[in-house]
Amino acid sequence: MPAIFRSVNTDLSKVDRLLYLVNSTYFFGIGKNTIWDTSWGDEVTEENPPMTESSVVSLPDIKLYKSPIYQTLAVESQCGTVDFDSCGNSEGSKKLTLINLETTSRETLNIISPSYLYFKIEIESGDLTFANIENFRVAGLYKDTTFNNPGQIRYLPTSVVNQGTLYWASYFTPIQKNNIITTTYVQEIIIKA
């Protein structure tokens, strides 16, 4: 699951860039409710979805956009509060501590020098009902997506004014609605900045 990190103004300090990014508006897009087939590659099947390329700029057939329930900065630590086996970066397993931005001073941020953006998204069966789909096979994190009626937590693609910039993308085997009726599909995304 590659992170697709787009450029940000480099005249800003590292902490300023991270604060700009974490305070931006993000939406998690899900879609592709049709099967994976060989039109995506000779070896592609439902059980063997295509690899996500870092050059991808948009996702196919988005059916729903939903805002993250939590987004913050994170820093590597030996006593991390969150352990990610697969963070979507090439550095492998990391222990990270999530930073409470409401209680952490700017001076402390400069000292601890966070290097990660953290997002948590939850997709429930009601979200799939809202989007009128039974499953999905792609997901992506978009920055600065704009909609006709701002202020909602989820949108259909017909409400999109500007899709924004794709920062993270993943293709996978189908997530079925009947599998998330009693549980919630949770996606945690770490992007090294």
Region annotations inferred by a language model:
Residues 1-136, 144-193:
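Small cysteine-rich, disulfide-bonded extracellular modules of the LU/uPAR three-finger superfamily
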